[in-house]
């Protein structure tokens, strides 16, 4: 079966993003050339997972990028879906510094929701969006192929690091074996990874999706890591977007309470990845239509760039 050429794929992308059409094929091809054959890790979560139009747009974006020669690895969350299932069975979800407190009952639900319904839906959407491009998505978790190894996390308090919070079966990543991911990419498959992993005793743990994405990006020596969120990016106290952030400014924003909740593991993962050599790290607004194509193939400033 014959698939579309790169110029034809760029024309497809231009149907979704007017700025690509405005820039023209030659300029867009130059931008694309700078990211082809270099791994892109995307953390997919938040509203982009629950809004049907945004779901379709995300699938179209990763399918097009893959067809254009960008090796894409998707690591997904599923907080809204987990919360809905916990509510259905009468369990109240709890969080400490953006990390889900995970007892044994909660772990079973998290595992089932992420590795079942959520992952299956993402894989199906990408396969449908990419079938005319020859793109094939495959779902797995961090347990498959012993890809992600963890130990039980004891979370230091953000204000007083001498205090540690026991948050249950939440995994701290101690190793990533990239062999399975690399084999899939070499076979022209698009890996979709649920952030579930096991410790050395085989006990299943929940891993924060931002953390998992960052660790996988580092292990893969990724060119780019993009963390999708429900807001414009990292915001200051006035709710204005911070275009660039580094470790020193992030530490100050944590200390004064500007950064809190789910943004804490996100910013920590982003800074860690940038410091460990991931080429470019961005926290971007997953509510923006076709945000991946906009960030990668146009000069649009969407979200917050992480600086070392």
Residue ranges and their predicted role:
Residues 1-287, 294-300, 307-308:
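Nucleotide/pyrophosphate-binding catalytic subdomain
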């Amino acid at each position: 079966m014959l698939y579309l050429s790169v110029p034809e794929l760029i024309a497809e992308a231009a149907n979704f993003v007017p700025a690509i059409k405005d820039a023209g094929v030659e300029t867009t091809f130059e931008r694309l050339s700078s990211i082809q054959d270099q791994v892109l890790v995307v953390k997919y979560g938040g509203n982009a997972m629950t809004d049907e139009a945004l779901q379709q747009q995300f699938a179209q974006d990763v399918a097009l990028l893959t067809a254009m020669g960008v090796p894409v690895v998707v690591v997904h969350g599923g907080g809204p879906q987990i919360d809905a299932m916990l509510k259905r069975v009468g369990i109240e979800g709890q969080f400490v510094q953006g990390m889900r407190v995970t007892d044994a009952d909660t772990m079973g639900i998290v595992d089932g929701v992420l590795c079942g319904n959520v992952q299956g839906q993402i894989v199906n959407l990408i396969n449908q969006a990419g079938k005319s491009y020859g793109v094939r998505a495959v779902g797995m978790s961090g347990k498959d192929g012993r890809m992600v190894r963890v130990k039980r996390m004891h979370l230091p308090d953000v204000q007083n690091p001498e205090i540690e919070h026991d948050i249950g079966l939440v995994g701290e990543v101690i190793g990533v074996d990239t062999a399975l991911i690399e084999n899939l990419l070499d076979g022209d498959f698009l890996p979709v990874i649920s952030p579930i992993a096991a410790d050395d005793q085989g006990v299943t743990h929940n891993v924060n999706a931002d953390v998992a994405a960052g660790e996988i990006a580092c292990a893969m020596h990724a060119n780019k890591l993009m963390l999708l969120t429900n807001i414009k990016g990292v915001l200051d106290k006035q709710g204005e977007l911070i275009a660039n952030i580094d470790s020193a400014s992030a530490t100050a924003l944590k200390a004064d309470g500007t950064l809190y909740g789910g943004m804490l593991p996100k910013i920590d993962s982003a800074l860690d990845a940038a410091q460990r050599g991931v080429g470019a790290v961005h926290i971007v607004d997953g509510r923006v239509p076709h945000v991946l194509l906009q960030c990668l193939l146009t000069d649009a400033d969407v979200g917050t760039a992480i600086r070392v």
